């Protein structure tokens, strides 16, 4: 497993958003393992589903990792959007996509946004009560999911398409294995 690092100049960037505890990404992360979630845009049915699924898992699964969202919008956009899905969500406003770009998130292809697998995932999200809304941010941006500790990226989910995301309720067990493996690699 490859362990990547978050560059210092990214960690030291000032942040603003909702329910934040610090002024830079480094301070916000501290040394605790954290799940970084980059949402596509607020109108995205899959982003709404992902936030709601993470909120449910965080409130019901023991030892769920601390979660920090990034979104392409203003502070006001975040204050309006997140309380509908998870009032306690911590989220960084990243309208210029500085953090999105730093973590290598790209724009999706036509197939990644509208392919057959995406439609099937849309049915899944709609069955959970989620629907498409007006985009806030670039609707072609792919989502991102990274498990980090301090400046180390321990794991990431490689999204195949806009509706692809892991089972958030079982994610802590997977991440615990990743963390043990990574710790052993760093010690040796």
Residue ranges of predicted features:
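Chalcogenol-based redox active-site neighborhoods
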Residues: 1-188
